Regions:
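Secreted, disulfide-rich extracellular signaling modules
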Residues: 2-490
Length: 490
């Protein structure tokens, strides 16, 4: 029963403290439960932050970006290209080839072939004219290595500008529920000394000769279609968030019913970019401009910008938190990062505020994504942007006590032992029955940006004096608020 009462006291104290305003926090007093002989105290400590330029992020994402536009807040240009491979089902089949031959004087031909590029979000001026080119890959990019968003498929010779390619002009003004644009692959296609009517005819004739190439993704990628590199080659003003790229080809079939009658019909096949094969984003940011931006406003704010833009580094005052409390239990540690509104909030072209951010130890940032880890609420956490409530217009981590304790145990092990990084992420969930769980955390590859109030710890500016105790109390713009508990000494 005593354990139960102890847990009850701690929970109530945590909830009470979480709702405290700044004045209450600065009292820094203690609450005593005489029955259970437990002493619970609270305190707050200043936290410092700064912007760090990401340079590149792991490009393992099902979403692609295509286009080029200017960040209205910073003036920085962002350009997106992507590589996609296509998946084939083991049951793939082309309709009765004899009927297709009858429609094409004995030849197996596709009437039309195109890449259907589908997007679920657009940024910028949707009517801005854009131009894209699809290059057939020279060879499939390897699945046994990691690629970052600054990878150069041309330099690494995965693809060449001399490869066969197809271009398309488009805009993003499509107002239907299903948004897409097409890149037609209808010009002559040449391979191994043979000329085909179009890329679809190449696919169909290859299937007729080697159906075994279509049984697995590996065989298909290495013998038929190594994928496409989709590159923005013209236009500035918008970007599209691509959720699927399909290769679709149509054909006509003639079936003789009797001597005087022939049934004419149209058929088609498709290959999709799926999770079973690679989709890789290539992001071009003006890195030098980002570095200037990060340093120019360092005293005012920090940034969260995606894709592959700017993160916020946080230095936690671990030693101060634990000083004098080495033998106490650290029950809760809450920290909130307030957002600064844009100078022009009404600009329709402003990038969206990142919806979710990850807090992860700085030295574990790279391995977290490469090893496909999930936030464990011990050394890594996620927080969603809140526009209402107690912590309005902020990202709040309700309890990182486990992280503080883990850092204290590793005190001094490496220069980043007390540092974490805030990173915009995309959280993917799956639902089984009535339970929804996080299944994947990727870098956010959408166009998102926000400024956070900078955390400082100036002895002359970021402290006040408690009127009762006369002690200095942290009053900086970002504070970590903690609750300790211990048994009272007899």
């Amino acid at each position: 029963m005593k354990i139960l009462r102890l847990l009850t006291v701690l929970v109530i104290a945590a909830l009470t403290f979480a709702a405290c305003d700044d004045t209450t926090e600065e009292i820094g007093g203690s609450i005593t439960n005489k029955i259970d002989n437990i002493n619970i105290s609270n305190s707050a400590f200043n936290v410092t932050t700064k912007s760090i330029v990401a340079d590149s992020v792991l490009s393992r994402n099902n979403m692609g970006l295509i286009g080029k536009m200017k960040d209205p807040e910073t003036g920085n240009y962002v350009k997106g290209d992507y590589m996609t491979q296509l998946s084939v089902l083991p049951t793939f089949d082309v309709d009765t080839l004899d009927y297709i031959k009858q429609a094409n004087k004995g030849s197996i031909e596709a009437d039309s072939c195109y890449l259907l590029v589908s997007y679920n979000a657009s940024y910028g001026d949707t009517i801005a004219p854009m131009k894209v080119t699809a290059y057939e890959m020279t060879k499939p990019m390897s699945e046994d290595k990691e690629y970052y968003s600054n990878y150069d498929a041309f330099k690494e010779r995965w693809v060449s500008e001399n490869n066969q390619h197809w271009s398309s002009n488009y805009n993003l003004s499509n107002t239907s529920d299903v948004k897409n644009f097409k890149i037609y692959l209808n010009k002559e296609y040449k391979k191994d000394g043979k000329t085909y009517k179009n890329y679809g005819s190449y696919i169909m004739q290859t299937y007729a000769e080697h159906p075994e190439y279509f049984k697995t993704n590996f065989k298909f990628l290495h013998n038929v279609c190594p994928g496409f590199y989709i590159k923005n080659v013209g236009g500035t003003g918008n970007m599209a968030k691509i959720w699927n790229t399909e290769l679709i080809f149509y054909w006509t079939r003639h079936k003789t019913i009797n001597k005087d009658s022939t049934a004419v019909s149209i058929g088609y096949n498709r290959f999709d970019g799926t999770e079973e094969v690679l989709q890789l984003n290539k992001i071009e940011n003006d890195t030098e401009n980002l570095k200037k931006l990060a340093s120019k406003y360092q005293e005012k704010c920090t940034y969260l910008k995606s894709p592959a833009g700017i993160f916020t580094e946080v230095t936690l005052p671990i030693e101060d938190i634990m000083k004098g409390h080495e033998k106490d239990t650290l029950n809760t540690a809450t920290i909130s990062f307030p957002r600064l509104n844009n100078d022009n909030e009404d600009n329709p072209y402003n990038f969206a505020t990142p919806s979710t951010i990850l807090m992860v130890q700085k030295d574990s940032l790279q391995s977290f994504f490469e090893k496909s880890k999930l936030a464990d609420n011990r050394t890594s956490y996620t927080a969603s942007y809140s526009s209402t409530g107690t912590y309005k217009n902020a990202y709040t981590f309700q309890n990182i006590a486990n992280l503080v304790s883990a850092m204290y145990k590793n005190k001094g092990k490496g220069e980043n032992w007390n540092k974490v990084v805030l990173v915009p992420v995309n959280v993917i969930t799956t639902t089984q029955g009535y339970t929804t769980v996080i299944s994947k955390i990727n870098h956010d590859m959408s166009l998102a940006s926000t400024r956070l109030i900078v955390g400082t710890d100036d002895p002359d500016k970021d402290y006040t004096t408690d009127k009762v105790t006369g002690k200095k109390v942290a009053s900086g713009p970002i504070r970590i608020k903690v609750i300790y508990s211990k048994f009272k000494e007899e």
